[in-house]
Swiss-Prot record:
This is Queuine tRNA-ribosyltransferase accessory subunit 2. Its main location: cytoplasm. It is found in: Cytoplasm. Non-catalytic subunit of the queuine tRNA-ribosyltransferase (TGT) that catalyzes the base-exchange of a guanine (G) residue with queuine (Q) at position 34 (anticodon wobble position) in tRNAs with GU(N) anticodons (tRNA-Asp, -Asn, -His and -Tyr), resulting in the hypermodified nucleoside queuosine (7-(((4,5-cis-dihydroxy-2-cyclopenten-1-yl)amino)methyl)-7-deazaguanosine). Binds 1 zinc ion per subunit. Belongs to the queuine tRNA-ribosyltransferase family. QTRT2 subfamily. SUPFAM superfamilies: tRNA-guanine transglycosylase. Disulfide bonds: none annotated. It comes from Drosophila virilis.
Length: 417
């Protein structure tokens, strides 16, 4: 993997180009496509191709949702992207699913807990590297203890750093020995919770490795994934990230997985983080929210979301978002998608996922354009206020509404009698 900086600005972050193997150059800041079990959630490969036209794509795969495929992949002699049905796509393998809350605990001295749909599996560093070798992704993260959050104690934070160092010693060794990983790039994990001292220790351990041992950094241990990432406070997170990036080489890309809010994501980009994922769009769709925030500076007021469970839109025949060119907005209305929610139709979530992914990919195009014009601060302020009088709240609230049978109507069969 090769990363080249195109420009860097104190106010607008850094633009770069990332090339994975022999792929086309990928522009950074880059949006990774979050997957579950190797598939884009709710979308077939054919539908996703329609959604992602003219957008660059890298698949973010997770071991916690694909662990059962390890044995069959060991016998696979083609690329991982071919195996999951997305031939030609670059692949990046993570340990944990950023879309779902990762349970805490289960951290023994020499193992990391892997929470899968089959239960908890204890991974040693040797077992982890064997599984990664079976997958043979283009890029993968080193094994780390990232079980920390804003409430973690100093003792838990220090343990996460010490254990990660032990895991990574074997990961660095095996990365150079395993034949199936000779074309793969290792990302060095930077952990340490919200302690600048612990983060510095983690960074020093990575930078002590011989040149070429790894090809980038992944900053972990800020949250427990899922909706927890949307609740992070900028005042807590940003100083720690800034402390980290100041100690990292400029020529190495930096990845931060998680469903960060659009506003916090922009602030992280300003600090110098290069790669993110689409888990925020997924979390919004699964909680019946269509992304409607504006990333084009205008004078109209905008909201962060449209809640399709709201009874107020049951007779609203406008698209989810005016002037949106996605398939959902071109073909369907708010009232119809509200009806799909009330009748528990899977198509409702599919249409929301199509819209949210399209909106988020276009958001990243706007980010790169603003950075090229050195206008990222103006975009941050626009996203922050959305032309309203108060800062917009981008936190995703879990949908706990229950649709009763009475609200679903009599149904077609009963109505025909």
């Amino acid at each position: 993997m090769k990363f080249v900086l195109k420009s860097i600005s104190k106010n607008s972050g850094r633009l770069g180009q990332l090339r994975i193997k022999q792929s086309k150059e990928l522009q950074t800041p880059l949006l990774l496509q979050t997957t579950k079990g190797g598939s884009i959630p709710y979308l077939s490969a054919e539908v996703f191709d329609l959604v992602s036209q003219e957008h660059q794509q890298v698949l973010q795969l997770t071991l916690s949702t694909m662990d059962q495929m390890s044995e069959s992949l060991a016998q696979w002699n083609r690329s991982l992207s071919d195996y999951v049905g997305y031939p030609g796509y670059n692949t990046l393998l993570l340990l944990r699913d950023p879309c779902e809350t990762t349970p805490t605990g289960g951290n023994d001295r020499d193992v990391v807990p892997l929470f899968t749909r089959h239960g908890k599996e204890s991974l040693t560093a040797a077992r982890y590297m064997d599984m990664v070798a079976n997958f043979a992704p283009d890029v993968y993260q080193g094994l780390c203890d990232a079980d920390t959050n804003p409430e973690s104690t100093k003792k838990r934070v220090q343990k996460s750093v010490d254990r990660t160092e032990r895991f990574m010693e074997l990961c660095y060794e095996q990365h150079s020995k395993l034949a199936r990983l000779k074309d793969s790039t290792l990302l060095a994990p930077i952990v340490g919770g919200y302690s600048t001292f612990a983060r510095t220790q983690s960074i020093k351990h990575a930078r002590q490795q011989p040149a070429g041992s790894y090809g980038g950094y992944i900053l972990e241990g800020f949250h427990t994934n899922g909706l927890a990432a949307t609740e992070l406070k900028a005042a807590q997170l940003l100083p720690i990230v800034e402390h980290c990036v100041q100690q990292l080489e400029e020529e190495q890309p930096r990845l931060m997985p998680g469903a960060y809010t659009p506003l916090l994501l922009l602030e992280l980009i300003r600090l110098g983080v290069d790669v993110f994922d689409s888990s925020y769009a997924y979390c919004a769709a699964t909680n019946y929210k269509a992304l409607t925030f504006s990333y084009v500076r205008d004078k109209a007021e905008h909201a962060a979301f449209l809640d399709v469970t709201d009874e107020a839109i049951k007779e609203d025949f406008k698209p989810l978002l005016e002037d949106c060119s996605c398939l959902s907005c071109q073909k369907h209305t708010r009232a119809y998608i509200h009806h799909l929610y009330k009748t528990h139709e899977l198509l409702g979530t599919i249409l929301l996922m199509i819209h949210n992914l399209h909106h988020y990919m276009c958001f990243f195009e706007a980010i790169r354009a603003s950075m090229a014009a050195d206008q990222l601060p103006e975009l941050i302020e626009h996203v922050r206020m959305q032309n309203t009088t108060a800062e917009v709240n981008y936190r995703i609230e879990p949908n706990n509404k229950v649709v009763g049978k009475a609200a679903m109507g009599k149904g077609f069969i009963a109505a025909a009698v």
